[in-house]
Amino acid sequence: LEINVDLTPIIGKGFSKLLALGAKNTFRRLPMTSRRQVLQGAAALGVASLAPAIHAQPKPVRIGYAMARTGPWTGGAQVSQEPNYLLWAEQVNAAGGLDVKGVKRPIELISSDDRSDVETCVRTYEKLMGSDKVDLVLPPWGSNANFAVAPLANRFGYPFLAPTALSRKLIEMKLPYFFLLLQQPQPMTNALVDMFKANGVKTIACIYVDDLFGLENYAALKVALQGSGIQMIEEKSYPSGVKDLSPVLRAIKDKNPDAFVGFTYPPDTILASRQAKEVGFNPKFFYASVGTAFQLYRNVMTPAGAEGVMGMGSWNAKTSPGAKAYFDAHVKKFPGKEPDRWASGHTWAGLEILTAGVKQVGLDRKALRDYIANTNHKTIIGDVKFSGSENIATPGTVSQWQNGEFEVVWPTKLATAKINPNKPAWK
């Protein structure tokens, strides 16, 4: 009996070469029992030779998060945060994995839809950190969600680098594991008022959404206005999910302020802009908040219609070589979808900080927290340094749509373009 078996897939090329060099003939002359023993031994040898390779495969770094994929938070979450998480994981894995103190390990993202619901968000993070015991977490979108999950960061000992939360109350809670990447309400409104003063504004009107974000920014604006010589001649709150702002805008138009300020979310930002155009309200300065920095705003309003509109923004592709590389990579992965010119950059900066921290100290979360808290970080948006939970290195900024780009116009040391102090007519 002659048995012809290709053992290469089992025992590797080396053993197969021995057969080719003469062992094959000897094998044929062996009794059947001996042949079986040779085959069994060879198979065992092959498995043993594979064992080191199997054991050498590094465990993935499991990183969990909840993100709005449905509900009213979706517009912000799916522009400013989740695309950046996906891009980061893809880039890191393509480079061999996350560097954990010199060992490259693949990233495994574990995520779910928080449905724009605070309770769902809290339950998800409790599970991720409490029972799933993921290695790291990434934050959810928005001030309300982050306010709810921030205490969990401290309870479970997981560093959070939050790129879309504005809240002085979060800073005052003194949570050592929670870090806010965005400029907070006071520096942002201080920059806005400084810009107004430098350009001769005497009167302003303000509307604000009646939630944590709107209330804190409105309060910060009132503080910033003290001693400025600028008078607030109208101030109105509105409920989340508002569908019509035209009565408020008509009343403001009648008072003819030099500047309009809206502490608004993306749907309200677009609503206020569209309805201001409809009622013919076109002050010298028109400033809205979240969403103004989005490509969506330019697309909906058209580049000509967005021209001169100001809002919360802090970077664009001109800010740094790293910012341009990030912008180009984002557009390549998500064709036709640009990162927004505010929180997207801060999201990426947070991922840069996390990457550098894990490389330096590994996955020891206490050591990682200490690294984040005590390091002056170099990022695409510039230096980031924390005092407590607050990023104190990134100054307040104002941006403005000019020729299809959301340009940083204040302060002048960070400007990517000169300010246009007279908004053109809506188009």
What are these regions (language model features)?
Residues 27-45:
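N-terminal secretory signal peptides and thylakoid transit peptides that target proteins
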Residues 330-344, 351, 355-410, 414:
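Segments of small-molecule ligand-sensing domains
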Residues 83-108, 227:
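Signal peptide-proximal N-terminal region
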Residues 64-88, 112-118, 141-144, 207-215, ...:
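Extracytoplasmic "Venus flytrap"
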Residues 76-80, 98-172, 181, 238-245, ...:
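Beta-alpha junction/loop-to-helix N-cap segments that form part of ligand/metal-binding clefts
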Residues 273-348, 358, 412-416, 420-426:
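Extracellular/periplasmic periplasmic-binding protein-like sensory domains
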Residues 83, 134-236, 284-310, 317:
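Extracytoplasmic ligand/sensor domains, especially the bilobed periplasmic-binding protein
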Residues 12, 25-32, 50-66:
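C-terminal segment of N-terminal export signals and the immediately downstream linker at the start
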